[in-house]
Amino acid sequence: MSQAMQPQRTSPSPDAAIAPARARGGVWQLINRSGIVMVFLVLFATLSLTVPDFLTPRNIQGLLLSVTLIGSIAVTMMFVLALGEVDLSVASIVAFSGVVASTLITATHSVVLGIAGGVLAGGAVGLVNGVLIARWRINSLIVTLAMMEVVRGLAFITSNGDAVMISEERFFDLGGGSFLGISYPIWSNIVGFVVFGFLLRKTVFGKNVLAVGGNGEAALLAGLPVMRIKITVFVLQGLVTGFAGVMLASRMSLGDPKTSVGLELGVISACVLGGVSLTGGVATISGVLVGVLIMGSVQDAMSLLNVPTFYQYLIRGGILLLAVLFDQYRRNQRRAMKI
């Protein structure tokens, strides 16, 4: 007649079930935001303690000056990668723009014309890249790999295979002058990071770039001008890289068609180390800045330690591989958080 009392079963609360996932997500977000900064701080502290003369004011200023070339191009490479594309032609654009600027200055003695010609030459290459990629829908890796060879060839043709010497001393002020004790190339980097950081995070254009990189088909269905956005980004990449080439020619006092070989790998490594996703849709200007400083610190330390060139290739390649692996790890974590 009496029934045995059954123990009452209680199902776990939904909030309790998702709490560990939220905790993991919070930890991952903290690592994702500050992890690369911690890596840089540990690296910088280690190099300061182990590498002679690394922390001297003169070397720090030299380090900042040495990363200006990578840094100036990384601010726009960030946009290219955020689209889910890539640009391997930047090193050739640097050489070509420097040669064009040097040739024009030597022929006309006009510094303004030379600078404008070099920058526009870079912009023209960027326009060709953008049209082929966005309008004709050719893979950006193939397009920019081909343009890397074409533009390098144009640099050799324009200079007849030799470096073009510059005699206009006014042109040297662009790369060698300073303001408030800080050289113009460093100032140009500061301006570049501020302007393009603002463009990425505070403007409709920047948000559209991230939207296109995150899901191009959805962006197209939402009415975004995907083709125009991609072409604009590649033109910006060309113009900024052209200016970087002109600045480098000013620092070297010549336009060299053989300069900056392999530069594109350093730029891409800095961006990926800084959290820019190779599949698009994710980018932060602060992360790119830290990535640039990491690349510069490693290169500076290798120079101070007189590391042989062939070992430097090995180390730079290893950094790029680690950056790609880290990017893959971040993507896996983002997928896990969405499940």
Curated annotation (Swiss-Prot):
CDD domains in the cross-refs: TM_PBP1_transp_AraH_like (cd06579)
InterPro entries attached to this UniProt entry: ABC_transp_permease
GO cellular component: plasma membrane
Bilayer-crossing regions: 35-55, 63-83, 88-108, 113-133, 138-158, 179-199, 204-224, 229-249, 275-295, 306-326
Keyword Membrane carried by entry: yes
MF GO annotations: transmembrane transporter activity
Subcellular location: Cell inner membrane
Pfam families given in the database record: BPD_transp_2
Main location: membrane
GO biological process per UniProt: L-arabinose transmembrane transport
Keyword vocabulary terms for this entry: Cell inner membrane, Cell membrane, Membrane, Sugar transport, Transmembrane, Transmembrane helix, Transport
Topology of this chain in the membrane: Multi-pass membrane protein
Family: Belongs to the binding-protein-dependent transport system permease family. AraH/RbsC subfamily.
General function of this protein: Part of the ABC transporter complex AraFGH involved in L-arabinose import. Responsible for the translocation of the substrate across the membrane.
Complexes and interactors: The complex is composed of two ATP-binding proteins (AraG), two transmembrane proteins (AraH) and a solute-binding protein (AraF).
Name of the protein: L-arabinose ABC transporter permease protein AraH
Species annotation: Azospirillum brasilense
